Amino acid sequence: MYFSQIAAQYSFEQLMSFGMRSDEKGDYATAIVSLDQAVEMKPQEDIAWVTRGVVRVHMRDFGSAVVDFNKAILLNPNRTQTYLYRYIAYRETENFQFAYSDINRYLGEVAEDTFAHIQRMDLSLLLSEYETFQTDMFWLYSKIGDAMILEYGQQHLQHFEKNKQCKTYANLVGQLYQMYPESKSIRQQYIAALFHAEQYAPCLDLLKIELSDNPNNVNLRKYQADALFFLNRIEEAANVYAQMLKSAPNDADLLADYGHCLLQQEKWVEADECLSKSIKAKNSSPAYAYLGRGIARYNQGKLGLACVDWERSYQLGEKAAKKWLDAHCKEK
């Protein structure tokens, strides 16, 4: 109350200055008191509403901030910065379509704002506005180069994989790669996108180029081996897995991958041994490993052990194990 009484003695400009300085210090309550006075003194001044809205954003009172920004825009629809501020408030309250409209309005006036392009790229991904996403992704790469891929590439890949749109993403990254064919970051991102889009043949073509310069990259070798496996080029896949195991002989997932190759080659004893090592080392897909080991043991004439493995596989969620149980383990 005391500050409110004193504040009334100051000019509009002084109240605004007090409010902004208090905001900078993190003293939001004092800032609001001062800016309330400024709004009351000159309610037709949009900047007072904008400034109070910004303080409310800092206070995480986003709903009240939107009210202030709405009033400011009503008073002065030509102050571009207000749309960016309201975008932030809308985004935080999950009013994504309104936020999208505001960030588009802002970038229509301030086209070179890198922060705003990053924000819109992220939001357009959330809204599956892929044309806008592409526009911002390409623009940002032209400005910040490989940092765009390194910072946001994994997030983008996860989004498209989750939404089963990997072919769309592969197409977008492919277009970017055509523009910047010398970029290793784009090429590696394109490899990942093609792999997740199940476009294994072109993925292998790019892997050949990348591995010639970077032969010891474990992630690239894994993509290569997996792509060969999915193309049913089992012997080639097995050779790559075997080579990788020389450097990481206890890698549970590599052991599982190699074991499944041995299974496809009908090397039952070796597959049994390899998958047993993988299960013992706790691979990330135990249900599939138990299924495979059960098949290897069945083909060695070890039906009892095979049935135990298939039962375990089915319990862990591998539906394909049910077929083997029904066909060979009816007593189970």
Predicted segments, located by residue:
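Canonical positions in the second alpha-helix
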Residues: 37-38, 71-72, 105-106, 139-140, ...
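Register position in tetratricopeptide repeats
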Residues: 24-25, 58, 92, 126-129, ...
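Helix-start (N-cap) detector for alpha-helical repeat units in TPR-like alpha-solenoids
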Residues: 11-13, 46-47, 80-81, 114-115, ...
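Short coil turns that delineate tetratricopeptide repeat
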Residues: 43, 77, 111, 144-147, ...
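Canonical tetratricopeptide repeat
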Residues: 17, 51, 85, 119, ...
